Amino acid sequence: MKKKALQKGIFRKAITLAGAAVASLYLTACGASAPTVSAANPAKDSGNTGSTTVTEEAGTSDDSAAQGQELQTLRFGSPNNGGKMLFELLEVALEQGILDEELASVGYKGEYYPIDAAGPGVNEALAAGNIEIAVYGDFPATSAKSNGIDTTVIGVANGIQPQAIFVRDEAGINSIQDLEGKIVAVGLGTNYQFYWENFVNGENLDLNKIQIVNSFDYATLLTTGDVDAASVGLSQAIYFEQQGLGHTLVDSKDHPDWTTEFLVVASTPFIKEHPEVGVAINRALIRARKVIEENEEALYEAGSSQNYPAELIKAVSQVAGTDGYNPALVVTDTSKRLQTVIDLMYNDGLISTSFDAKDWVDSSYYEKAAAELQ
């Protein structure tokens, strides 16, 4: 009988979100640095302390923010991308000045925090009230929602994130079945785990014959030989291959339903009180989409970091395309995709409470933004 991809108790112990202390213990145990909200993005000196006064009209709004009122702070968190935000399409808006412009038009300025420990770190920041807006994967976002963190999906930063299984050349893994008897790194609570869950179930692998290591430090573990393979994003797989760490065994291009999304998630109490912020963020996403339609290089440059150069992002886009960088997906696709994630996690015992994705996703912010920009 096929085993579930990860045991219910193990997963829940790893990503319990009852409090920051529990999350910190988890992060220490897996060898990651604590994901307290860190310094602002060093690649973008946005001056993220104190207040900012806007003296020129910004964005498409005629709000009083443009008349010199003091801006309120809006804190964004995302996984750390080599010292930058992992913002996907929203990173284009940030680098082009569009996001700051739209936020200022409704009386806000952004503070941008790259957070260590990927999705679980972002969840901890949300749970602690350290950020109002999170940009991260659907898998950890679903875990947070199921565990009682009150969030609303207000946008999509990337609707198609390709994944891969990467292996060391010396590990003797030449086929999918060769993974049995090996050691595989899987970052629990991340989108990479969602792909791994689907992959193991779809390929009918016997998990009793695979040792799972919960870590985000894939490069080090592959280099030292402490793991034989890792479930990673396709961009990481291409980068690791360029670094001579091994090769990609299989990727998700033949299973688009196994890919994941990068969501824009807001604290529900905050966004209900300040709906104009959700609209402003979606205006920024729509404008950023137009930028890359006219100049695709803007996408590669905005997402590049010290670990992932523009050429690497371009290589991934050549495989996956750029259709995922479409904020309209929050209307047409996201609820359906998220329901698949919720159902898989619940059926595999990875979350204890199921819920309806349609009640979680609020596309009204996008719809209003699109109408305003017509």
Where are the regions that the model predicts?
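C-terminal motif of bacterial Sec signal peptides marking the signal peptidase cleavage site
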Residues: 25-29
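Bacterial lipoprotein signal-peptidase II cleavage site
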Residues: 30-54
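Extracytoplasmic "Venus flytrap"
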Residues: 59, 68, 73-95, 189
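Conserved C-terminal helix/tail region of periplasmic/extracytoplasmic solute-binding proteins
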Residues: 343-374
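Flexible hinge/capping segments at coil-to-helix
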Residues: 168-183, 273-276
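Pocket-lining segment of extracytoplasmic ligand-binding domains
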Residues: 139, 211, 217-305
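Secondary-structure end/capping motifs
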Residues: 80-84, 273-352
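Short helices/loops that flank or line small-molecule/ion binding pockets
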Residues: 119-132, 146-148, 177-180, 202, ...
